Structures are given as C-alpha cells and as structure tokens.
C-alpha cells in the first residue's frame, strides 16, 4: 500500500489570499538573487537533487491552479510511467487536483497537501507567516481575454482601462465609444456586456487584476489585486469556477467577456470564443502567441530573484504579450521525513528538466520553458526541501 506523504506541521490559521504583484522576499535563507552559483554550491545542489523517486511507494498530493492542471496531469502521467517497480507499478503515486491557486496555496501552507500549484506567488506577508514555504517556478504561461461575439470576426483590441471600466460597470455595451475608438472600422454590436469572473480563489484573478492595476491604477486599486477579491457590483455579471467553468460559462452567454488561462486555448477555440489583442507596456497590441509570450518573459526572466517571486505583468517589452507569469509549485522545506522530501525533490527536478520539453509536454498547453538561469534558481530551491 502506498504511503501518503504529509508535511511535518499544520498551521492553525489559513493563509491570507491577498497575493500581491510586487516581488517579495522570504525570511528563509536563500542564495543570491543573481541566479549564479559557485562550482562548490552547484555541486551541493546537484547532490541534493535525486533524479528518480525512492522505492517506498509514496503518494504525493498536489492541487491548485486550473491553469497548470492540464500540464500537471500530463507530467504526472509521464513520470509515473517512467519510474516503475519490477511489477510495473509506479514507484510514486501523484494525486492531482484542480481547485484554484488560492486553495492550492492555502492547502500547501497549512500542511493539507504536499504541493500547491499556483499562478501567483506568496506575498511577503504570507512568507513571514509561513517562512518554510517556497515559490518554485515550473514553467511560463499566460492568460487570454476571450469574448462571445459571434458577429465580430476581427480580433478586438482592448486595454487595461477599457477592461477596468467593463469590470466596474462603467462600460456596459459592446458598441461603447471607448471600445469603438480602439477598433476603428469594426462593426460592434449593440449588445450588453456580461463580465465573467472566477468564483473560486484563483491565480488567474491575480493575473487579470494585476494587469488592470498596471494599466489603470486610478481605476483599479492595488488593494483589489489578488487571488480572491471583492468584485464591483456590476449588473448581470457572472462567476464560474475554474478555467473550464469560465470557458463553458462564456460560451453559453452571448456578450460575455472572460479571462481564461492559455492552457485552455484549444477549448476556447472549439467553443468559438473570440480572443482579444491586448495593449502592452510599450503601447503595442499583441495576441498571446509563443513569440509574444516569449518576448514578454525574455524581458524580465533575467531579473528573477533567488526566491523566484517575479511579476511579468505589463512589462515595457516590444512585441510582448502583457499577461505572462511563472507557474509555481508552493512547497514546504520541512517534510515529514527524508524519504518524503526525496520523492518531492525528484518529481520537481524532473518537472524543471525533462518536463520542459515542448514537443512532449509544453506545446500541448501553449506554455513556454524556463530559461536555463531560472532552472538553476528552481534547482536551488528544490534542493532545500528536506525533513
């Protein structure tokens, strides 16, 4: 029988879910934020990173981000098939779930699960509350803005100010003059806009509200940026759970607008939803493609600190798509025992090395791989996971 890995502690209080966009520091010891390491340090990290699981039939529990969930499912399936015992059974079982980033953060921080998957990193205050927790970058993803306008065939240009006014109820019709000004020559319907947002605590909400605040700080306050927020009271607005719910809800509601993770691109296309081109920090309008996501990430990944808490929202990157992020594993450095720690280290190491293959894993969910400098930072953090 598989043994379930548990953390070495439980916390009485739930983690605050006001995850902020600014890069934050950890109270835990960490290597230099430059991402470089000495040969001796690299050797120490390498010796702490097993490349295969133990043989004690452990079970690792993971839940959280619905944006990361499709990739995590592919990763865990491949990992369990690669590492098997003489009877053909997996050496380690990995249980995954799509509950939203906020739940993943909370459950990992309070010891309910081993790995919390999140599109958002822990805020500095959360890191002070839970100093043993780490934000480990696993891949680079992005977020779409989708809409249900069957008569509009040209991708609509939108910016943070217009989106803010839609989600605060100031713009209520698709043929509003502010939208028309961004889209000259496009025939916009006299149709009521139905803003759709997440009902669950979500990293996608963190990303979306971060973009609104970055482009229109007077219209969308930084105090209303997070995984779980107080949405303005907008007539007709709807809420759905998970990215899957957002796709289904938007597809069923003519006039809807929604923010949906890039890993659901094939589903939004199959549902016939339009995809906006968004204004970036350089004043350009870009769609989320491999090239534009990479352009945004490349402008910032070199600034990733040792604890990997970095916002890539609305950078001043030419050709960059403005809603890009790291996908994180939120993990405690203090596991129940050495075997548990070894198995978690081995799986996460596999994710940031073998799991970075575009052909085998990332391309199917429209994610981008970590640059080698960030892989080194993730390795450094993974190596800290112990008992």
Stretches with model-predicted labels:
Residues 18-23:
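C-terminal motif of bacterial Sec signal peptides marking the signal peptidase cleavage site
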Residues 1-12:
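Bacterial N-terminal signal peptides that target proteins for export
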């Amino acid at each position: 029988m598989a043994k379930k890995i548990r953390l070495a502690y439980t916390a009485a209080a739930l983690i605050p879910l006001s995850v902020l966009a600014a890069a934050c520091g950890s109270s835990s010891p960490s290597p230099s934020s430059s991402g470089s390491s000495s040969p001796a340090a690299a050797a120490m990290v390498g010796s702490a990173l097993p490349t295969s699981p133990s043989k004690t039939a452990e079970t690792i529990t993971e839940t959280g981000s619905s944006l990361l969930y499709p990739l995590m499912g592919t990763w865990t399936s491949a990992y369990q098939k690669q590492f098997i015992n003489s009877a053909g059974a997996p050496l380690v079982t990995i249980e995954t779930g799509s509950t939203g980033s906020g739940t993943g953060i909370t459950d990992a921080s309070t010891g309910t699960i081993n790995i919390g998957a999140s599109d958002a990193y822990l805020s500095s205050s959360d890191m002070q509350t839970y100093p043993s927790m780490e934000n480990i970058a696993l891949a680079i993803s992005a977020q779409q803005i989708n809409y249900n306008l069957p008569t509009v065939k040209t991708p609509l240009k939108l910016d943070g100010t217009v989106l803010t006014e839609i989600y605060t109820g100031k713009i209520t019709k698709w043929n509003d003059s502010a939208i028309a000004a961004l889209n000259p020559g496009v025939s916009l319907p006299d149709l009521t806009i139905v803003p759709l947002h997440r009902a669950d605590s979500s990293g996608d909400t963190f990303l979306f509200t971060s973009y609104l605040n970055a482009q229109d700080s007077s219209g969308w306050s930084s105090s209303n940026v997070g995984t779980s927020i107080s949405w303005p009271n907008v007539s007709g607005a709807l809420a759905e759970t998970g990215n899957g719910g957002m796709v289904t809800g938007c597809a069923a509601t003519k006039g809807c607008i929604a923010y949906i993770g890039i890993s659901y691109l094939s589903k939004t296309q199959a549902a016939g939803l339009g995809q906006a081109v968004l204004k970036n920090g350089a004043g350009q309008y870009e769609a989320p493609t491999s090239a534009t996501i990479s352009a945004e990430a490349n402008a910032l990944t070199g600034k990733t600190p040792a604890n990997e808490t970095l916002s890539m929202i609305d950078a001043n990157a030419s050709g960059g798509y403005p809603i890009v992020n790291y996908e994180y594993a939120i993990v405690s450095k203090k596991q129940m025992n050495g075997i548990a720690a070894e198995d978690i280290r081995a799986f996460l190491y596999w994710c940031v090395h073998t799991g970075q293959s575009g052909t085998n894993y990332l391309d199917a969910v429209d994610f981008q791989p970590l640059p080698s400098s960030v892989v080194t930072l993730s390795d450094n953090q993974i190596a800290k996971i112990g008992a």
